[in-house]
Amino acid sequence: MSIRIGILGYGNLGRGVECAIRQNPDMELVAVFTRRNPEDVTILTETAAVCNIADAADWKDKIDVMILCGGSATDLPVQTPEYAKMFNVVDSFDTHAKIPEHFANVDAAAKKGGHIGIISVGWDPGMFSLNRLYANVVLPEGKDYTFWGKGVSQGHSDAVRRIAGVKDAKQYTI
């Protein structure tokens, strides 16, 4: 029996999640939910449905885990608690200062719905945070280094694009 997965949001992250699911034989992508017209969205998994985000509730008994692939600025603070009432959810919320608030909102909604909500499962916070934790346990007097620096920030670019009147934007760290 495979874990039935839904993806909510099919931008760069959603497409990457689909590719990861395809590499795991114990997982099955059953549906992708989008705000766009589903007929305009082409996915790699031929057996999965592409649906409007408004139809997600109709799938609550057909999906074991909904992976939320929206942005941390405006999508996930609303979407994760909303969908945690209906599904076990995973998100990549990365606004560090707001993680306690986001956790409290998701936890309350998930408990109310009898589900599990796992937040901030990304690079940082997420995998990089765990790696730093493990390294600090082994080398308590060590020093942390990160590679944040020059380049395009997807999260910041997403936040700028959501400002009323902005047609498109990219945020560069120089």
Regions found by a protein language model. Name each.
Residues 3-8, 12-17, 134-174:
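Active-site-lining helix/loop region of Rossmann-like oxidoreductase modules
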Residues 23-44:
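NAD(P)-binding Rossmann-fold cofactor-contacting core
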Residues 91-92, 117-121, 147, 170-171:
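General beta-strand structural signal in soluble alpha/beta enzymes
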Residues 49-56:
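Short acidic-hydrophobic, aromatic-tinged amphipathic segments that line or gate anion-handling sites
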